[in-house]
UniProtKB/Swiss-Prot annotation:
It catalyses: S-adenosyl-L-methionine + a thiopurine = S-adenosyl-L-homocysteine + a thiopurine S-methylether. It comes from Legionella pneumophila subsp. pneumophila (strain Philadelphia 1 / ATCC 33152 / DSM 7513). The keyword Methyltransferase applies. Keywords: Cytoplasm, Methyltransferase, S-adenosyl-L-methionine, Transferase. InterPro entries: SAM-dependent_MTases_sf, Thiopur_S-MeTfrase_Se/Te_detox, Thiopurine_S-MeTrfase, TPMT. S-adenosyl-L-methionine binds at W12, L47, E68, R125. GO terms for molecular function: thiopurine S-methyltransferase activity. One of its GO terms (biological process) is response to metal ion. It is found in: Cytoplasm. One of its GO terms (cellular component) is cytoplasm. This is Thiopurine S-methyltransferase.
Length: 221
């Protein structure tokens, strides 16, 4: 287990998962239709944790593919929502699945790419920003390989003074997004908003005075 894997396993084991939200993300609800996902289309949710957004996507009629490093996160998701799953292991990747939900337990960088069938869309609420800068280019490349031509990504990022806090979540500038996805046909900024200070906000509690949140729609050519 490398340093990054140990870090995330430790967070889940200790219950330090303030990044997990109990409510469906409002930006997902607001912008999912703009991706024009076909009926019963496949949606990839990388570094999915136990996100309730996955269940919401399934209820909209989509087939959801989640990839998560920490098995405890997936087991909690299945138990909390009383989902009856089947189990399969392929190489080093374990899979929990139903007819419309595939949850892979593995390091996304070690996963045999051929195991994931092409997807119509990718929903990234907190995956890119969970990765340090040196890993982000490889992550983008992997995801784009799984995305069908013409498919779209709904991506949420944030920007703040990285010198004060090392992350995660990491600050990702609009300039980095433009560079990282330059091979795509279209990059659209759907939303740019200064975050309102809330008592339980991790970054504000660490002394960050300003956080900007962004929502992007990126279409693969």
């Amino acid at each position: 287990m490398n340093k990054g894997q140990y870090f995330w396993n430790e967070l889940w084991c200790e219950g330090r998962i303030s990044f997990h939200k109990e409510e469906v993300n409002p930006d997902l609800i607001a912008y999912i239709s703009s991706l024009n996902i076909p009926a019963k289309g496949r949606v990839l949710v990388p570094l999915c944790g136990k996100s309730v957004d996955m269940l919401w996507l399934v209820r909209q009629g989509y087939h959801v593919v989640g990839i998560e490093l920490v098995e405890k996160a997936i087991l909690q998701f299945v138990q909390e929502h009383q989902i009856t799953v089947r189990e399969n292991t392929t190489g080093q990747a374990k899979q929990y699945f139903t007819d419309n939900l595939n949850l892979w337990i593995t390091d996304i960088f070690a996963l045999n790419a051929a195991l994931i069938e092409p997807v119509d869309a990718i929903y990234d609420r907190a995956a890119l920003v969970a990765l340090p800068k040196k890993l982000r280019p490889a992550y983008v490349d992997i995801c784009l390989k799984w995305l069908k031509p013409g498919g779209s990504i709904l991506l949420k990022t944030l920007q703040y003074n990285q010198e004060k806090v090392q992350g995660p979540p990491y600050s990702v500038s609009p300039e980095e997004i433009a560079l990282s996805y330059q091979q795509c046909a279209k990059i659209e900024l759907l939303k740019s908003q200064k975050r309102i200070r809330e008592p339980n906000d991790h970054l504000f509690n660490l002394g960050i005075s300003e956080v900007n949140d962004y929502v992007w729609r990126i279409r693969k050519g």
